[in-house]
Amino acid sequence: MKKAIYFLALTISLGVSAQDSDYSVSSYLDEGFKAPNTHYIGEAWLNRLLQADDDLTYNITKATFKENSTLDWHKHGTVQVLIVIAGTGYYQEKGKEPVLMEAGDIIKCEKNTEHWHSSSKQSDVTYLALYGGEKPTIWTEVLTQEYYDSVFKKLVK
């Protein structure tokens, strides 16, 4: 038991000292900033964890969508990977049926594939989005509240 307490104390002190050092340390636990209401309905929070640069060719952003919030249809010039870390949401690619996405799910969206993703009507969702470089998101179509509500009725029985 003493060894476990010692190990825990050492681990905590190392974590604190790493955050106070010259290392580039951030936390995905931070909620981030409230996103401006552009291209989505509801409330979203973003934490830009890593930004692409000369040495790193992709971005990692933590996104939290409060319940009953959704993004518009969009696509990316690179592959996007969503790693759902909490909650339940919806995901759909153009021409395919929508699906539930839940904590633990990993979704790969191929480049230039129109899609949308959101929280569910009854739950927040938090995911890590990994996507390439500096190419901006291409917004293609507004996702209406009526369509979002129809997805809810289809997926929740």
Language model regions located:
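Bacterial Sec-dependent N-terminal signal peptides
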Residues: 1-21
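A short, N-terminal "cap"/entry segment at the start of jelly-roll beta-barrel domains
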Residues: 18-57, 137-157
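Glycine- and acidic-residue-biased ligand/ion/polar-headgroup-sensing regions
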Residues: 77-90, 94-95
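Short acidic-glycine-tyrosine-enriched beta hairpin
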Residues: 95-112
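Ligand-binding loop in jelly-roll beta-barrel domains
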Residues: 90, 111-137
